[in-house]
């Protein structure tokens, strides 16, 4: 379907009218919708897996793990927690507000939310965000990616079969349709994608002063640091697994590895072994190995690989017909080269060497670049690891592990700086789609004349006693 500007405007009007009925304020209504959303995902897993294979070449197992099971876990958390989270907070008003003794903080929905989702996890990053919006009591327009055509079509059909359009609807189309949505006066915008488009979203949102959440990849990518005392086999195995996932098209994926020079060659050999063990000698013929999303994405990866052809120590092959490009290790790479100064979003893995004794200099270089969405460190030195993870600027990460911080219940998923703003998952998602409203309960039969005109020295003295 091709949308006009009027079509989008009318959808927003209908959703606002639905919101103003007050139906979504009922927490039991929200829980019912979340349960319907969960059933939608579970009852249509085969259709979802097929769409993800068509778009991204994902295996059934990877599709279920990344875009179905993880979404269901997220929805379960909202179903279980939303009643508790939505309860008003009780606060004492304090002596300065006497005779009032009671103040409540209500958690109120914004209204009409706009969710703009990317191609790489078309269900996780649309339905997962939708669950947060529903839990918060909003209506939702989902602008799904035009790149993941099969997934967007399935998502559009499933949402249409599950919810009325005045409550939740999926809109497909390109950047022009996204701009139609952004021009509308919605009440909350949640965007997942690149920093450049994130800036455009913020600029458009500023015209209506619409609050925005941005989940971005970060302009200089996510680092993995491998110290000389790390378990190299374990680190290589986990890094290879993660780079294979979705052919590297993951916002929290490892963009580049910095490995201690003392163990760099050994680490490279372990990395090669891990890749071969997991996806074989020829991943281009392995049906479990995903593909890139489009010809343009393939061409960009192929072009960048060719620029570093003389330093490719593993991989470096692709298939233009299937858009598959093998996991490719580029080594050694200087920390100032272009490939480690932008987000690759693909299966290329540049490896930088550093002297382990000069780890602080490395971390200083990383700290001066744009903040990544994730950071991963591999070391036996837990004290150092904790210090780094508690002082660097990044979204989230792991010590001696990859990506699993995303699966932990009750903790936020977020970026900082050029990797985003705002947080979601569980209670953090509920908070992101609600705003607090503080209400003081006054008295009608007893007032304090102290605050009223005319003022005198006695009143000022008493005010001083109250307000200190």
Question: What name fits each language-model region?
Answer:
Residues 1-103:
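N-terminal Rossmann-like NAD(P)+-binding subdomain of aldehyde/semialdehyde dehydrogenases
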Residues 30, 75, 137, 168, ...:
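Residue-level signal for inorganic ion chemistry
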Residues 94-234:
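Rossmann-like NAD(P) dinucleotide-binding subdomain of oxidoreductase/dehydrogenase enzymes
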Residues 2, 25-26, 225, 325-468:
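Conserved C-terminal structural/oligomerization subdomain of aldehyde/semialdehyde dehydrogenase
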Residues 19, 23, 38-41, 45, ...:
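Structural signal for hydrophobic packing residues in well-ordered secondary-structure cores
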Residues 2, 163, 196-335, 356-360, ...:
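ALDH superfamily catalytic-core signature
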Residues 91-99, 170-173, 238-239, 311-313, ...:
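Short gly/ser/thr-rich secondary-structure transition/capping motifs
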